[in-house]
A protein has these predicted regions:
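Bacterial Sec-dependent N-terminal signal peptides
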Residues: 1-15
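Beta-strand/loop-dominated core regions that host nucleotide or nucleotide-derived cofactor-binding catalytic loops
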Residues: 12-136
């Protein structure tokens, strides 16, 4: 039973030396209004260390969880989530995804930015803590 308690305590959570941010702004995470999300999604991502030094993002993966209202077989409404994934080289979303977010994103949708690679001060690629944004 002791093994399970340490599993759920979060002690084994990986520590990252860098954290990724939208538009290099530390306040743009968690819940964002659609208006704010649409305005910052066009800007590059950046990463920062614990000393707030900025580093260049080399690549990242994105998962977009788009919630929609559908009808089940008996005509009752149900909320269903469609998942889209993309990989990006560099520090920006593609123009197609920026346009898609602006046209399709809605309250309750979630964007996950994961598997972020950062160019560190040693000119080597490092893993970076990802980001989760929920549109409200």
């Amino acid at each position: 039973m002791l093994g399970l308690s340490s599993f759920f305590s979060g002690q084994d959570e990986k520590k990252y030396p860098y954290t990724v941010y939208l538009s290099c702004n530390e306040t743009l995470q968690g819940f964002l209004s659609k208006q704010v999300f649409d305005s910052v999604i066009q800007y590059p991502l950046c990463a920062k260390d614990s000393l707030k030094q900025t580093y260049q993002v080399q690549s990242f993966d994105m998962t977009y969880a788009e919630r929609g209202l559908y009808q089940d077989s008996s005509g009752l409404p149900i909320v269903f989530t469609d998942y889209s994934q993309a990989q990006f080289t560099g520090n920006q979303f593609s123009p197609q995804w920026i346009r898609s977010f602006r046209e399709r994103s809605y309250r309750g949708d979630t964007v996950y930015i994961e598997n972020v690679k950062v160019l560190g001060p040693d000119n080597k690629s490092h893993a970076c803590k990802g980001l989760k944004v929920i549109i409200r």
